[in-house]
C-alpha cells in the first residue's frame, strides 16, 4: 500500500489526484502518520504532493496535525522548496496557536518572508498572517509588527500581499 501511495505522490498531480490521496488518508484516518511519513521525503514532489493533499482536509481533520505543529514549523523554515514551504505554512495557518506556542525563530522567519520583496506572494501572505497571529499575544510584538507593516513599500508587492497587509492594519485600527 505504501509503495503505491508513494508512487502516486511521485506522479504529476492535479486537483483530482490530490483529492484522491486526501480521501485515501481520510479513509485510513491517519493524518499524522501520512504527513510525518511523506513531508520529509527526499523527493520534493512527494513532500509537495503529500502536503497539497493535506490542504484538502477539513479544519477538524487538519486539527489532528496539532501534535506535529513544531515539526511543521521546522519543515517550513528548513525547506529549500517554495511549494513545500507554502503548503506547510498553509497547514500551520489552519492550526490552533496559543500564547505558549510562540517560537521566536519562527516569528523571525515569518517577518523575513513577509517583507522579502522578491518572495512568492503565497509565502509572503501566509507568513504575514502567521506573524500577526503570533504577535497578537504580546503588545510589544504587535507594535513592532505594525511598524514593520507600515514601513513596507507597497509599490513593490503584489496585490495579494497588499490585501493581507491592509486587512491586518484595518483590524488593528478598529
Whereabouts are the PLM-identified features?
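Alpha-helical scaffold domains
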Residues: 1-174
Amino acid at each position: 500500500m505504501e509503495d503505491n501511495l508513494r508512487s502516486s505522490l511521485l506522479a504529476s498531480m492535479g486537483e483530482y489526484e490530490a483529492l484522491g490521496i486526501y480521501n485515501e488518508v481520510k479513509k485510513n484516518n491517519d493524518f499524522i502518520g501520512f504527513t510525518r511519513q511523506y513531508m520529509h521525503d527526499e523527493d520534493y514532489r512527494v513532500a509537495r504532493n503529500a502536503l497539497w493533499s493535506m490542504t484538502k482536509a477539513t479544519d477538524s481533520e487538519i486539527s489532528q496535525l496539532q501534535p506535529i505543529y513544531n515539526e511543521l514549523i521546522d519543515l517550513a523554515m528548513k525547506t529549500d522548496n517554495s511549494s513545500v514551504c507554502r503548503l506547510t505554512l498553509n497547514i500551520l495557518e489552519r492550526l490552533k496557536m496559543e500564547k505558549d506556542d510562540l517560537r521566536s525563530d519562527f516569528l523571525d522567519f515569518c517577518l523575513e518572508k513577509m517583507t522579502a520583496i522578491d518572495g512568492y506572494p503565497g509565502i509572503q501572505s501566509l507568513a504575514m498572517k502567521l506573524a500577526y497571529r503570533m504577535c497578537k499575544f504580546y503588545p510589544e510584538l504587535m507594535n513592532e509588527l505594525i511598524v514593520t507593516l507600515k514601513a513596507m513599500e507597497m509599490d513593490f508587492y503584489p496585490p495579494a500581499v497588499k490585501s493581507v497587509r491592509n486587512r491586518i492594519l484595518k483590524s488593528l485600527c478598529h
